[in-house]
Design a protein with these regions (language model features):
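N-terminal strand-loop element at the rim of the active site
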Residues: 2-49
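Short hydrophobic beta-strand element within catalytic cores of glycosyltransferases
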Residues: 259-263
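Short His-centered aromatic/hydrophobic patch
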Residues: 72-79, 97
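A conserved mid-protein helix/loop that constitutes part of the nucleotide-sugar donor-binding site
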Residues: 1-6, 160-186, 193, 200-207, ...
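Donor nucleotide-sugar binding/catalytic pocket of nucleotide-sugar-dependent glycosyltransferases
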Residues: 118-152
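Aromatic "clamp/platform" in nucleotide-sugar-dependent glycosyltransferases that forms part
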Residues: 223, 242
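Conserved acidic donor-binding segment of nucleotide-sugar-dependent glycosyltransferases
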Residues: 274-276, 280-288, 295-302
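A short, well-ordered alpha-helix in the C-terminal region of glycosyltransferases
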Residues: 289, 296, 303-318, 324-330
Length: 333
């Protein structure tokens, strides 16, 4: 929702007339919305038994406001917009998918392929995601990554802090990172690992910190609004994620000029981190290699600066608001 809201706000600022159509009866947004954006309610829950009725009302709303494009935020929305299209809804339908083709069940794969077939265009996050679709559909699929707000400041890379940000869930691999940090702290007891995030694995991770006697070397910080303060104060960014569909935090780290060490897990990191240029991509679960690359950056300020400068420049070229919205403008022209 944060990404979707950010895109809609920026499009409104750029002169596009943006109308958000919501299911249900609640107009509340978890994130601030541009005053230029209009919100309309279908007034029907997003449930299977109501989808045909919802499609009828969606067709009515869309044909009244006459947009050039109808953007489905996520593939499930396509089910209703497809029915609405069959009922006579006008406008080109674009489906914006934030997940990989094979995320979820076999039905999910079917719906994604069907969605790409019936949509005017489909937006995916990475080139890997695009290439996972059948070849005949790829010409209708565009790669537009999530944009990241430009950092006002960048780290001076002088602190003795390593940062990792994300939900405290199994796929993010914080348990692996703690094992790696247990070895690193024996050599660099003056460095601190900061883990910022909340989630179901919180207590398990706290127990692991105690078992590894890392209470003085690891700080666990709940999700915060001022996350930029932690990026600015760090010298290295690390991710031991087992799975990362895109990797918003990696792009954020680059915006602050942080060198990155992360596992080359499916599907996002290799699309963001350039191995040996602005960070290091480590073979999945090669904990020893990750430890060595982190230690190398700890011991070499000039290497941190080299990677950090390259990270910042690459962010501006590929992940900044300007770069991403050039692609949106091309799509919507």
């Amino acid at each position: 929702e944060r990404i979707s809201t950010g895109v809609m706000n920026e499009l409104a600022d750029r002169g596009y007339q943006v109308v958000i159509v919501l299911f249900g009866t609640d107009k509340t947004s978890a994130f601030p919305l541009n005053d230029k954006i209009k919100i309309l309610l279908i007034g029907i829950p997003f449930e299977n038994k109501y989808k045909l009725k919802a499609a009828f009302y969606l067709k009515k709303i869309i044909n009244e406001i006459k947009p050039d494009y109808v953007i489905n935020v996520a593939v499930p929305m396509m089910q209703v917009s497809f029915l609405a299209k069959c009922l006579g809804m006008k406008g080109k339908v674009v489906t914006w998918d934030h997940f990989t083709l094979f995320a979820g069940s076999q039905w999910g794969v079917f719906f994604r392929i069907f969605s790409a077939f019936v949509s005017h265009q489909t937006i995916v996050l990475t080139e890997q995601d695009r290439n996972s679709y059948p070849r005949l559909l790829r010409k209708k699929i565009r790669v537009i990554g999530n944009f990241v707000m430009d950092a006002k400041f960048k780290s001076n890379l002088m602190s003795k802090k390593v940062l990792s940000v994300g939900r405290l869930v199994h796929t993010k691999g914080f348990d692996i990172l703690l094992d790696i940090w247990g070895d690193i702290s024996k050599r660099h007891s003056d460095w601190i690992l900061q883990i910022v995030g909340s989630g179901e694995e919180k207590e398990n991770l706290r127990k692991k910190i105690e078992e590894l006697h890392l209470e003085e070397n690891v700080q666990m910080i709940p999700t915060v609004k001022n996350i930029e303060d932690y990026y600015i104060d760090a010298s290295i960014y690390v991710s031991a994620a087992r799975l990362e569909p895109w990797g918003l935090v990696l792009a954020e780290a680059k915006s602050f000029g942080l060198p990155i060490v992360c596992f080359d897990c499916p599907h996002g990191p290799k699309n963001i981190v350039r191995d040996g240029m602005d960070g290091n991509l480590i073979a999945l679960n090669d904990c020893n290699e990750m430890k060595e690359k982190i230690l190398l950056l700890m011991d070499d300020l000039e290497l941190r600066r080299k990677y950090g400068e390259a990270a910042r420049k690459d962010f501006e070229c590929r992940f900044s608001k300007r770069a991403i919205f050039n692609k949106w403008t091309e799509l919507l022209k």
